[in-house]
Amino acid sequence: MRVSDFDFELPAERIALRPAIPRDAARLMTVAAGGAIGDLRVSDLPSLLRAGDTLVFNDTRVIPARLAGERDRNGLKLSVKATLLKRLSVSRWTALMKPGKRLRVGDKVHFTPAPLRGGAEGSRIGGEVGRRSGATPNGLPAPPSGADALAATVEAKSEDGQITLAFDLSGPALDDAIAMVGAMPLPPYIAALRPEDDQDRQDYQTVYAREDGSVAAPTAGLHFTPSLLAALEAKGIGRAFVTLHVGAGTFLPVKVEAVADHNMHAETGEISSQTADALNAIRAAGGRIVCVGTTALRLLETATDEAGVVHPFAGDTAIFITPGYRFRAADVLMTNFHLPKSTLLMLVSAFAGVETTRTAYRHAVDGGYRFYSYGDAGLWFRRDAS
């Protein structure tokens, strides 16, 4: 297949710059296994699932991965920006930096706090309103401002432009410093239209996030509220949590012409033995596995064998799901509306069928659905599922 097979026209006004309020007021397009389309709200989700089904959530937490500061080389200062990509150890991260070509191995970089801009009260990371002012996510005092707020040394530079930073802090102390110094890494299609502000620290985080490590949100989960979770539980719909730390590669364009030639980026994830056992029991009892987001689906498919048995998993996955893939674990997928020619649109096309997906996306565009991270969602029933 050609990448151009997954192209479509999207008017700029369809790109959502803010989420629905409340979160579960977002529109929800349902796409049945046979292709029938319905128009509802996310708050209607309990009526669309059955007792015994289980929602699989990605509990990763977005970190404020955008850092700004100065390189100091023998008194020669240079303003720099960094986007953290992947944690390598308790004190080391890979990052994309500007201007990366002017940085050398051994350079010292001092990062300073990002200015606060409007928005709601509460956490800089979001999702836990009410932390005391000046405190980190762990309730610790904020690191000092100025040149000593957070420092790192350029440890290595790779041919693909990534830079390895060795920070002066490690473990929870480093996490706390990043939380106070960094800014939320809004997707490029939003950042190009407006600046990040304090409201994003809540909006760009799921209410159940708990494992720090992502530089992009698992956006399908942004629609869930405590009241919606309670309504699902009251109907007998279960929940399970997996962790996949979403990397900046999720926004990278596909630059090849043939789908088969694309080199998929890797992301780090984990499924516990308890979660694997629970999902296998749900499937054995006739319940459906409902993946909340493509990240949960990709991790679950990585950890599931040909017989449909989910196994514990810890490591990297670079699974690239395209039409023709045989799904092993997921029965239903809830996901936002994705970019043209993206790997995520290819995944949805594999799940629901290429023509069904094209028809549904035309319906979404014509019907005024809001697209991308802060936009509306679709509930897709696998094309070969009963």
Residue ranges and their predicted role:
Residues 1-113, 138, 147-386:
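Surface-exposed, charge/polar-rich loops and edge strands
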Residues 113-148:
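Intrinsic disorder/low-complexity segments
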